[in-house]
Regions:
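Beta-strand-turn-beta hairpins that frame and shape the catalytic cleft
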Residues: 23-26, 164-177, 217-224, 247-248, ...
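Short beta-strand scaffold segments in enzyme catalytic cores
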Residues: 16-21, 179-180, 240-244
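Low-complexity, highly charged intrinsically disordered N-terminal segments
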Residues: 172-192
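Eukaryote-specific, low-hydrophobicity, charge-rich regions
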Residues: 187-245
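Long, compositionally biased, glycine/small-hydrophobic-enriched stretches that function as flexible linkers
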Residues: 1-175
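Metallo-beta-lactamase
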Residues: 128-173, 180, 196, 305-344
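Active-site flanking residues adjacent to catalytic metal/cofactor-binding acidic residues
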Residues: 253
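Active-site metal-binding motif and surrounding structural segment of the metallo-beta-lactamase
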Residues: 37-87, 95, 249, 257-309, ...
Length: 344
């Protein structure tokens, strides 16, 4: 009989997910947004092995359980190693789709409709050339970085088992609906199949109570509310995002995850913020934008067609919804570079 799991071998992350300590290094089960901020400050550090749990997306909270973009960058550029993703065969293609989109960008780009005058506009960048430059592998003499340089996969077999380097194995137990982790033949942990998300962590109860207003919030004629000022690798600060107030109406820009709850705790309701600007496609802001699609009815989103198309492809792979279904959740307003855009 295998030895019982060690309690100190399992670490629950504050943002969701579980890390299991093994002799071959930590293994993370479930990867909700920003969990790298938990592991960067942990004793064991950022894992190099990640188990993608099914389903990949929580529709109730609108949160991905497989946010691998920042762990990939940290492992590749800082640790100089590729990550290992453990998943089912059916899940692998979805993971490959959104990782390639996130790491390398769109395969095809057409900026003509995004610039006045099309190809005749001198301001139009050579985006293909820029992408090729940044895709150079700094550890291989500048040759083109491939997905295999960043990620390798280990797939569960038909019995729900997988063998990993270092004599580590993971077995799915249907009876208990969980995963057992073995280190050199000894069971060191058991992880539930269903990932538990912690209560919304944007605002703690004590802080929320202290922020309660004596009178209802009234949006300013002009102003800015900063939701966060940190970046995706800053464990001490919330990811950047803000609300721009114009004529008593709010426009949320690059919303981080759980931004709606953060605002609600300050009595800023959904009716106050009725438009969204997405400036880029990193996962820390994809997470908040995707979440808003599942929290409320269609919200107008203003961004370029290139950014929107990339967002839709990633969202489709993460949620399992078709691209047409994802688009149906969005009130999209394309932006053309140069002329002013009227919002609200």
């Amino acid at each position: 009989m295998p030895r019982k799991s060690k309690k100190n071998a399992v670490q629950k992350l504050s943002r969701g997910g579980v890390v299991v300590e093994t002799s071959a290094g930590p293994i993370q089960f479930g990867i909700p947004p920003e969990t790298i901020k938990d592991t960067m400050t942990s004793k064991s550090g950022v894992p190099g092995t990640f188990v993608a749990l099914d389903p990949l997306f929580n529709h109730e909270r609108g949160i991905s359980f497989c946010e691998l973009e920042f762990p990939i960058y940290f492992n590749f550029y800082v640790m100089r190693r590729k990550i290992r993703v453990v998943c089912s065969k059916s899940t692998k293609q979805r993971v490959v789709t959104f990782i390639k989109e996130a790491a390398f960008g769109p395969e095809k780009i057409n900026l003509i409709s995004e610039y006045i005058g099309g190809m005749g506009n001198r301001a139009m960048p050579d985006l293909h050339k820029e992408m090729s430059f940044f895709r150079r592998n700094p550890f291989k003499g500048g040759e083109r970085t491939q997905l295999s340089d960043m990620v390798t996969f280990s797939l569960f077999d038909k019995d729900g088992a997988v063998e990993l380097p270092g004599d580590i194995s993971i077995r799915y137990e249907k009876a208990t609906q969980g995963y057992r982790v073995f280190d050199n033949g000894v069971q060191v942990a058991e992880v539930a199949e269903k990932l538990e998300l912690p209560a919304n962590r944007k605002t703690k109860t004590k802080e929320a109570n202290s922020k309660r207003r004596k009178r209802p919030f009234y949006p300013p004629l002009f102003g800015v509310t900063v939701i966060g000022s940190g970046h995706g690798f800053d464990p001490t600060a919330d990811t950047s995002g803000f609300v721009l107030w114009i004529n008593h109406r709010g426009i949320i820009v690059d919303p981080p995850v759980d931004s709606t709850k953060w605002l609600a705790d300050r009595e800023v309701t959904r009716k106050h913020v009725n438009a969204l600007i997405l400036t880029h496609c990193h996962a820390d802001h994809d997470a908040g934008t995707l979440q808003k699609l599942f929290e409320e009815q269609k919200i107008p989103i203003y961004t370029s067609r290139t950014i929107m198309d990339s967002f839709v492809r990633k969202a489709s792979a993460i949620t399992g919804l078709s691209q047409s279904r994802v688009r149906s959740l969005i009130d999209y307003h394309p932006i053309t570079m140069g002329p002013p855009i009227r919002i609200n």
